[in-house]
C-alpha cells in the first residue's frame, strides 16, 4: 500500500454583504484519475476492474484524449510547459510497454469504451505535497499562496484547528491534512480579486472561488470528494472564534 500525503489550508472570511462564512476552493484542470493514469500508477493484470473504475472517474474529454494514444498531448495536458524530461521519458516508456507495443493500443481503447458515465473536475481546498524537510504548516502556507496568490500577511493561522481525512484508490491511500486560517479584515470584501495570473497556478488549476456552506454541500454531492466533513467543522470553529473575538 502506497501512502500519498498532501497538506492544505482552509482559509475563511466573513462575507460582509451576505453575513455568511466563506472559504476559498480551487478547481483542478484535470481529474485525479487522469493524473494517476498518465503517471502509470496502476497495475496490468487479468482483472482490469481497477482500470475501468479509473476511466469511469475521468471526464469524457480526458478519455477521448487517451484514445488518441498521443502520450505527448496527454502529458502536457497536465504539465503544460513544465520541463520534467526525465519523468516524462520514464512514464512514456511504461505507457509504450503497457499499451502500444502489445497491440498498438487496441486493448486500452477497448477498456476505455467499457467506462460508464463520466467524472468531474474536483473542487478542493488548496493543498499540495510537502518538500523535503518542510514542515506541514510551511507546506500548507506555500501551497496556498501558489494556488491563490494570497500572501501570508493577509491571513491569521488558528493553530488550535487541525483536521485530516483519508481515502483509498486502488493500492494507494491518500491522506490530506488541513490547517485553518481567517482572512484579515481588510480583505473581507465580497469583490476581493482572485486571479490566475501566475504560471504556477495556471498549470494546476482552472478556477478559484469563494464558497459558503450551502455551495460546499452542493459541490460535494456532485463529485467523489466530500468536502463537508472537513469544511463543516472549520466553519463552526470560525463562528466560535468570531463570536469570542467580538
UniProtKB/Swiss-Prot annotation:
Keywords, sorted A to Z: Early protein, Eukaryotic host gene expression shutoff by virus, Host endoplasmic reticulum, Host gene expression shutoff by virus, Host-virus interaction, Hydrolase, Magnesium, Manganese, Metal-binding, Multifunctional enzyme, RNA-binding
Motif Nudix box in this chain: 128-149
Binding residues annotated for Mg(2+), in chain numbering: 134, 143, 147
Entry EC number(s): 3.1.3.-, 3.6.1.52
Chain segments annotated as coiled-coil in the UniProt record: none
Reaction catalysed by this enzyme: diphospho-myo-inositol polyphosphate + H2O = myo-inositol polyphosphate + phosphate
Main EC class the enzyme belongs to: hydrolase
Subcellular location: Host rough endoplasmic reticulum
SUPFAM superfamilies given in the database record: Nudix
Family statement drawn from the similarity comment of this UniProt entry: Belongs to the Nudix hydrolase family. DIPP subfamily.
Function: Decapping enzyme required for the removal of the 5'-end m7GpppN cap tethered to viral and host mRNAs to allow their decay in cells. May therefore accelerate viral and cellular mRNA turnover to eliminate competing host mRNAs and allow stage-specific synthesis of viral proteins. Acceleration of the turnover of cellular transcripts may even promote the shutoff of host protein synthesis. In addition to the mRNA cap, g5R also efficiently hydrolyzes diphosphoinositol polyphosphates.
Designated name of the protein: mRNA-decapping protein g5R
Protein species of origin: African swine fever virus (isolate Tick/Malawi/Lil 20-1/1983)
Lineage, broadest ranks: Viruses, Varidnaviria, Bamfordvirae, Nucleocytoviricota, Pokkesviricetes
